[in-house]
Amino acid sequence: MGSNKRAPLPYRTDRTKNFEKAWKRYNKSGRYDMQAAAVAMNLVTNRNPVPAEYRDHELTGEWAGFRELHIGGDFLLVYRVDEKSEIIYFVDLGTHAELFE
């Protein structure tokens, strides 16, 4: 007894066109585990702690204000959290080479 039944309201979400194109491309190719990508998205959307294996971190330089987490290996999810508006923007998916070079 006594378990807490309260939870914060999940963030609202939005997706960029780049994110949607990447999702469709990777989902069609079968190259990466898109179920794992959906799990990672749910973790951040529902304000759950992101496990250390995702290596979630802030980006710097021209990507300052964005975050990145590792879905598996070098497969990355780039997103941005707008705390004031309580929205998570899913920005892109891909490898380091595809996203940052």
Predicted segments with their positions:
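Basic, Lys/Arg-enriched alpha-helical interface segments
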Residues: 1-73, 82-88, 97-101
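Acidic, metal-associated active-site segment
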Residues: 79
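Active-site flanking residues adjacent to catalytic metal/cofactor-binding acidic residues
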Residues: 91
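Residues forming the ATP-binding cleft of Hanks-type serine/threonine protein kinase domains
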Residues: 94
